Amino acid sequence: MNSSLVILYHREPYDEVRENGKTVYREKKSPNGILPTLKSFFADAEQSTWVAWKQVSPKQKDDFQADMSIEGLGDRCTVRRVPLTAEQVKNFYHITSKEAFWPILHSFPWQFTYDSSDWDNFQHINRLFAEAACADADDNALFWVHDYNLWLAPLYIRQLKPNAKIAFFHHTPFPSVDIFNILPWREAIVESLLACDLCGFHIPRYVENFVAVARSLKPVEITRRVVVDQAFTPYGTALAEPELTTQLRYGDRLINLDAFPVGTNPANIRAIVAKESVQQKVAEIKQDLGGKRLIVSAGRVDYVKGTKEMLMCYERLLERRPELQGEISLVVPVAKAAEGMRIYRNAQNEIERLAGKINGRFAKLSWTPVMLFTSPLAYEELIALFCAADIAWITPLRDGLNLVAKEYVVAKNGEEGVLILSEFAGCAVELPDAVLTNPYASSRMDESIDQALAMDKDEQKKRMGRMYAAIKRYDVQQWANHLLREAYADVVLGEPPQM
């Protein structure tokens, strides 16, 4: 039986392990993000395929077993791995994706690298994904393609399956037209996205940026515009947009556009919070603090995440307000990049240098101002930190959405706490009750940390309660249901909940 739902995502849905000489799939250790929700749709479809890449040696490639069935799901669900050599992965993911596309998407054009990019390899791998996806798909299947790594897959799928439904979701920011058009491959990328039936983005601003790019490169016509949904802030912040283009015409095709940000999984997070082991960890953290106020700034090592600017602001805080020395602690869990991601080496060195400088200047025998962790924390440990934290300091220079901010709010369950959030994080237009700040302006950063530290408990609860209600209303399940409704998919997944 052919697949009615095909998901294209660069990661496999399960961890692949060897047990007793046999390859088996196990649930991923970290349950956060969109993978659990994608897997639920993958498992519920009548017949489905998940296409991802798998790094193999050149020798393994010759007799590689591409298809794996999932224990407990019978023959209904297939994970199809596209075998790539280490050299292909390096050029496709570590260099072309991260050194050429990533800086442009996040509006850091001075970080853009052209000479080392391998466009031919990128095209080839996208074609391999499309061919793997189409191999046993229904002619009118829904192909759900994820993110910029697979920009070219929609056009290749359309060529192979002209009647298919193709939905693309862009998980990163989509930059302004003058920034995006720096890419020398811009026409091919836009041509492929215009082969979709639906292009989804986190927020209205990214939709409008895409429309501006498409209109600058192709003879497209805007056929429908609407006022933005009440879930989005329409004006007054850096990424606000009052109106949204929801349909384009390109030749004889109509392309639907929409803004529907990825949500988190409140039920899962609350279940983790309720665990005895997590509650014990929260108590231990608070005991170790000894009455100090805890600030958490979680993320990963990346120049777009603003960790350097946040640490510089923290240093200024301790200088400006010496009475806070010994009274507050900053915990910075930022997972370092995988080996081979050379673009992030300087960012990590700078973060480590600044943390060391702050500790060298201000530390006492009884107090360490900054606790920096670059090894990944277990998800339950991170949630425990959020529960214990008085303030979450999430101030990226640019971020497509930022689920960490939402996870902090859910972990606090509408109780006391303060979220400091960059205006340049996509979720800022969903969470106006955060203390919004401009990480490019040191004075605004200083004002925001002062405001957070001074906020009274009643105000904290009011703000956190409103943010929690908004996040619960539009969780990750709603996000996925939204896409399926928009794509008019012939996939039986039960009645989506009402929004």
Curated annotation (Swiss-Prot):
Annotated transmembrane regions: none
A molecular function (GO) term: glucosylglycerol-phosphate synthase activity
Subcellular location: Cytoplasm
InterPro entries named among the record's database cross-references: Gluc_glyc_Psyn, Glyco_trans_20
Entry's Gene Ontology BP terms: glucosylglycerol biosynthetic process; trehalose biosynthetic process
Catalytic activity annotation: ADP-alpha-D-glucose + sn-glycerol 3-phosphate = 2-O-(alpha-D-glucopyranosyl)-sn-glycerol 3-phosphate + ADP + H(+)
Pfam families (UniProt xref): Glyco_transf_20
Main location: cytoplasm
EC number of this enzyme: 2.4.1.213
Pathway info: Glycan metabolism; glucosylglycerol biosynthesis
Keyword annotations: Cytoplasm, Glycosyltransferase, Transferase
PTM field: Seems to be degraded, at least in vitro, by FtsH2. In an ftsH2 disruption strain inactive GGPS accumulates.
CDD domains: GT20_TPS
A single GO cellular-component term on record: cytoplasm
Superkingdom as given in the UniProt entry: Bacteria
UniProt record similarity statement: Belongs to the glycosyltransferase 20 family.
Functional description taken from the UniProt entry: Involved in salt tolerance by producing GG-phosphate from ADP-glucose and glycerol-3-phosphate (G3P), an intermediate in the synthesis of the osmolyte glucosylglycerol (GG).
NCBIfam families per the UniProt record, alphabetical: gluc_glyc_Psyn (TIGR02398)
Known partners and oligomeric status: Interacts with GGP-P.
Name assigned to this protein: Glucosylglycerol-phosphate synthase
Organism per entry: Synechocystis sp. (strain ATCC 27184 / PCC 6803 / Kazusa)
